[in-house]
Amino acid sequence: MLHFLPAPILFVINFVWLSIGTTLISIPVLLMALIKLILPIRPVLKVVDVVNQLAFKCFCLNNAFLIRLTNKADWDIQGFENIKINGSCIIISNHVTWADIVLLCHLYRGRIPITKFFLKQSLIWIPVIGQVCYAVGMPFFRRYSRAKILKNPK
């Protein structure tokens, strides 16, 4: 719809929209994280998970709207007919751009359960984003050098 605008204006629209949307969506997730810490009992944890999944769906919908609003993208997607919505699946992608997460959420939205990503441990320190990813249960990992692994393989 707005793809005809000059790139600097599209950048501002995307940046502002993503910043506001991400901040608004992160508020309930961070509140749920506090509740999860204070009341770690099964019924409360189930409610927290439902709220977090809803927030993540809102994040994906917000991003999908922005992609449609500011881009003229023609998608050629094949293979969705074999995806089982109720089952788990592993998506393997060659990490090419910072937009991978946003694009995968957009493309698989409504077709598979909530997408979780393995994230580098250092990303947990990014304000708001890192804490939200931790709160919704995304796994973090550390990368070790070959020498360090050989020295201590545990």
What are these regions (language model features)?
Residues L69-K154:
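Soluble catalytic domains of membrane acyltransferases
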Residues M1-C89, L103:
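Membrane-anchoring hydrophobic helices of lipid-metabolizing enzymes
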